[in-house]
């Protein structure tokens, strides 16, 4: 069985584009849950460009599934997570100029800082995952932090148009997933996955959960949120046979 985490950031982006109260990402989360989402992912960025604390507070109190809060290792957001104690937090790198998260955490390069954040979140009864590139060096460092989960960055696989390069990137993801599993880590994956490329990743047996946002919200513009979520979940389950 493979789980689907639906990222609702882009619903909030649409709301913030006009400074209105709608569309409400909280409502989108409820629709996604009813359509088969196993978790709801939201990124509370330091600059609060889309998801805001109000969203996280309501989601943490009302979701029937799980809230996976994406966040940088930044003091203000860490305090929010400690206070609200969502089911899961995924630590990600963050730069103000980026449109979306552009790569995995350099866990090995900032091991003590990330380890401290993991310990603080664990003390708040939050399960921590680390968003990392499919690199054995980073996976070994992730294990040293005490985080029980890693999320493999699938962006290079998803964004390349070259067939040979895509196959190579998929091989790296598969190898990394196997290695992380051998270390005792739960393996999730995400970034750039859509309705055309998701099945090859969903078929990797070591991967437990995929987090997908932009493709689902974009598809929802034409077919509605419930259908968009159900379509993605169906593709994932088909890939697992």
From Swiss-Prot:
InterPro entries: Aldolase_TIM, PyrdxlP_synth_PdxJ, Pyridoxine-5'_phos_synth
Site (Transition state stabilizer): 151
Location in the cell: Cytoplasm
Residues involved in 1-deoxy-D-xylulose 5-phosphate binding: 9-10, 45, 50, 100
SUPFAM superfamilies documented for this protein: Pyridoxine 5'-phosphate synthase
Enzyme superclass (EC): transferase
Subunit structure: Homooctamer; tetramer of dimers.
Protein name: Pyridoxine 5'-phosphate synthase
Family: Belongs to the PNP synthase family.
Species for this entry: Acidithiobacillus ferrooxidans (strain ATCC 23270 / DSM 14882 / CIP 104768 / NCIMB 8455) (Ferrobacillus ferrooxidans (strain ATCC 23270))
Protein's UniProt keywords contain Cytoplasm: yes
Role according to the record: Catalyzes the complicated ring closure reaction between the two acyclic compounds 1-deoxy-D-xylulose-5-phosphate (DXP) and 3-amino-2-oxopropyl phosphate (1-amino-acetone-3-phosphate or AAP) to form pyridoxine 5'-phosphate (PNP) and inorganic phosphate.
Binding positions for 3-amino-2-oxopropyl phosphate per the UniProt entry: 7, 18, 192, 213-214
Known EC number: 2.6.99.2
Keywords assigned by UniProt, alphabetized: Cytoplasm, Pyridoxine biosynthesis, Transferase
CDD domains in UniProt: PNPsynthase (cd00003)
Keyword Transferase on entry: yes
Pathway: Cofactor biosynthesis; pyridoxine 5'-phosphate biosynthesis; pyridoxine 5'-phosphate from D-erythrose 4-phosphate: step 5/5
Reactions catalysed, as given in the entry: 3-amino-2-oxopropyl phosphate + 1-deoxy-D-xylulose 5-phosphate = pyridoxine 5'-phosphate + phosphate + 2 H2O + H(+)
Gene Ontology annotations for the cellular component aspect, listed alphabetically: cytosol
Molecular function as annotated in GO: pyridoxine 5'-phosphate synthase activity
GO biological process, one term: pyridoxine biosynthetic process
Primary localisation category: cytoplasm
């Amino acid at each position: 069985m493979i789980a689907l985490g639906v990222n609702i950031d882009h619903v909030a982006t649409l709301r913030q584009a006009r400074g209105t109260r709608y569309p409400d990402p909280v409502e989108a989360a409820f629709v996604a849950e009813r359509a088969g989402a196993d978790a709801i992912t939201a990124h509370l960025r330091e600059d609060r460009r889309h998801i805001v604390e109000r969203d996280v507070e309501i989601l943490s109190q009302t979701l029937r599934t799980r809230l996976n809060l994406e966040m940088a290792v930044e003091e203000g957001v860490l305090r929010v997570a400690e206070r609200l104690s969502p089911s899961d937090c995924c630590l990600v790198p963050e730069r103000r100029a980026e449109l979306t998260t552009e790569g995995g955490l350099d866990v090995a390069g900032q091991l003590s800082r990330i380890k401290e954040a993991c310990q603080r979140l664990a003390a708040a009864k939050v399960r921590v995952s680390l968003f990392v590139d499919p690199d054995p060096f980073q996976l070994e460092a992730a294990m040293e932090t005490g985080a029980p989960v890693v999320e493999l960055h699938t962006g290079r696989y998803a964004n390349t148009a070259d067939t040979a390069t895509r196959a190579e990137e998929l091989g790296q993801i598969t190898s990394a997933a196997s290695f992380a599993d051998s270390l005792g880590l739960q393996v999730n994956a995400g970034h750039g996955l859509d309705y055309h490329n998701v099945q090859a990743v969903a078929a990797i047996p070591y991967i437990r959960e995929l987090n997908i946002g932009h493709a689902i919200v974009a598809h929802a513009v034409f077919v509605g949120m419930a259908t968009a979520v159900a379509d993605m979940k169906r593709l994932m389950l088909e890939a697992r046979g």
